[in-house]
Amino acid sequence: MQPFTSHTGLAVMIDSANIDTDQIIPKQFLSKVTRDGFGVHLFHDWRYLDDAGEVPNPDFTLNKPRYSGASILLAQENFGCGSSREHAPWALADFGLRAIIAPSFADIFYGNSINNGLLPVKLSANEVRQLMDEVASEEGAQITVDLTTCKVTSPLGAEFSFTLAESARHKLLNGLDAIGLTLSHGIQIGEYESQIPSWRC
């Protein structure tokens, strides 16, 4: 998993609340069990005018040329609600997004994102609105998300602080998923197992 320390990238926004996982990645695309290949289906029902995904919707934000290559998504409250499918953060990450900034997230989506290297940043509704206004007013607007300082810097230089549980921050800073985190304690695990009596094995 790629470590997340500090990232500066083009920002895009979907100014809607309660964006659920069915909208992020519709159910018909969930047959794969590997993490790659989902980006093309991200927000399928909004991005395309046809079921086959061959006719882009020119009015959808992510299809606008000015947001091509965006790596930071702004959204409103309760992002990632709905079913618990882990494919949602897979699709967002495969599309090229590194961070999602919103006033609140659904709990399961929030945890799944951290476990898959996608940083969910909680800011106040007013702070998110300011970021959206700045992004909308200037083409090519970039936002910096710094996990080492837990600060977000807006396109015009305003700084906003955010919090993240230290365990989650440690995993993201070091690029550790659940397996990687376990392996990082390999020495301690080995020492513990060496002390277990053979009759208990």
From Swiss-Prot:
Looking up Gene3D superfamilies in the UniProt record yields: Aconitase, domain 4 (3.20.19.10)
Family the UniProt entry places it in: Belongs to the LeuD family. LeuD type 1 subfamily.
EC number annotated for this UniProt entry: 4.2.1.33
- The answer to whether UniProt assigns keyword rRNA processing to this entry is no
Q: Which domain of life is it from?
A: Bacteria
- Quote the catalytic activity from the record: (2R,3S)-3-isopropylmalate = (2S)-2-isopropylmalate
Name-wise, this protein is 3-isopropylmalate dehydratase small subunit
Organism annotation? Shewanella sp. (strain ANA-3)
Keywords from the named record? Amino-acid biosynthesis, Branched-chain amino acid biosynthesis, Leucine biosynthesis, Lyase
Task: Quote the NCBIfam families the UniProt record gives.
Answer: leuD, PRK01641.1
Tell me the GO molecular function terms.
3-isopropylmalate dehydratase activity
Enzymatic class:
lyase
